[in-house]
Amino acid sequence: MIHMKQLTSKEEWAESYPIMSELRTELDIETYLQRLEACVQKESYMLFALYENTAIRALCGALPRVSIHKGEHLWIADLVTTAPCRSKGYGKMLLDYASDWARKAGLGFVSLSSGLQRKDAHRFYTDKMGFTIESYLFRKPV
């Protein structure tokens, strides 16, 4: 049985690490848990999980944001499905779940960024999820 929920306890966060580490390969569990706690406390970050029976199969990390330019929206910071479960529609289910959360919260839209090399992900976002490409995201170390 498939079900989704927001993960709120440190135990649930630790349980999510093996899935998130498929996306965030540079993070060990200690760093992951420290950053996750900081994101929740400082940024109102939410971690949604898709379960197949009792096992986490996919994760979506999101946070509400507001900008002068676009107003209130939901930013998808992380989206990952464990490799053996890809192409089962789990990413779509989680993005739909996050979009429903945003709609109920009165937010105007959902946005995300995706690495330039992730061509399959880009097709998924545009062709299957209805996202449009509006900008590049730039980064500079300080």
Curated annotation (Swiss-Prot):
PROSITE patterns assigned to the protein according to its UniProt record, in alphabetical order: GNAT
Gene Ontology MF annotations: acyltransferase activity, transferring groups other than amino-acyl groups
Any matching Pfam family: Acetyltransf_1
Keywords: Acyltransferase, Transferase
Record carries keyword Acyltransferase: yes
Record keyword Ion transport present: no
Source domain of life: Bacteria
Gene3D superfamilies: 3.40.630.30
N-acetyltransferase domain sequence ranges: 2-142
Family the UniProt entry places it in: Belongs to the acetyltransferase family.
Protein name: Uncharacterized N-acetyltransferase YhdJ
Species assigned in the record: Bacillus subtilis (strain 168)
Gene that produces this protein: yhdJ
